[in-house]
């Protein structure tokens, strides 16, 4: 049962959202995760095809890599009482013809993000995963390259932790930038562990 009627109405509105439907090859299927008790917020780009099919955020190889970066098992990662997950867009955008996915639809984040984040008052750390999330929440970083932005990761703490997207497309970048694994990931793991070790409220509304 949802304790806050306003929260329940927001969830219903999101699940019924079709504002991008004419542009979505598989139709609208908004995917978000989290409870208002969540301490860690992960904001990425948009669901991939496998996530669309399974309705489970980061249920793919990108998710495997992200969980490795965070040193989290699946049980902890998918604990909605502690971890909330949003995309810049909530629905799968389709393929781009070059082996990757199309960009997230631009209508989604302005329509829903502020409303959802208002119901996540316990968030202590927000991961901005990939260029679309970074550009949306840190527009001042444009037009810097991904490498330049990630090199400045300390500048955005303690609120935001910037990361490249963990997709296969980032493999060459990771090989070319070994400092990410040796300098950034240990700090990421330490901060995530500290945030997730905090006690969770005993009573939480229904998941988002």
Feature-to-residue mapping (PLM):
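A polyanion-binding, active-site-adjacent surface
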Residues: 2-196
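Generic C-terminal helix-cap and adjacent flexible tail
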Residues: 190-208
């Amino acid at each position: 049962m949802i304790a806050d009627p306003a929260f329940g109405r927001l969830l219903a509105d999101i699940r019924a959202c079709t504002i991008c439907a004419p542009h979505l090859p598989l139709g609208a299927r908004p995917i978000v995760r989290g409870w208002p008790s969540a301490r860690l917020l992960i904001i990425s780009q948009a669901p991939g095809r496998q996530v669309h099919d399974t309705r489970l955020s980061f249920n793919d190889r990108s998710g495997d890599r992200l969980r490795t970066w965070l040193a989290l098992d699946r049980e902890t990662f998918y604990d909605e009482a502690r971890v909330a997950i949003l995309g810049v867009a909530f629905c799968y955008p389709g393929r781009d013809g070059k082996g990757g996915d199309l960009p997230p639809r631009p209508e989604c984040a302005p329509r829903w993000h502020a409303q959802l984040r208002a119901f996540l008052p316990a968030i202590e750390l927000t991961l901005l995963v990939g260029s679309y999330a970074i550009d949306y929440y840190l527009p001042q970083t444009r037009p810097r390259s991904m490498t330049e932005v990630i090199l400045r990761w300390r500048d955005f703490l303690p609120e935001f932790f910037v990361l490249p997207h963990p997709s296969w497309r980032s493999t060459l970048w990771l090989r070319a930038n070994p400092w990410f694994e040796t300098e950034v990931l240990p700090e990421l793991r330490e901060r995530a562990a500290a945030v997730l070790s905090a006690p969770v409220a005993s009573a939480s509304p229904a998941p988002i």
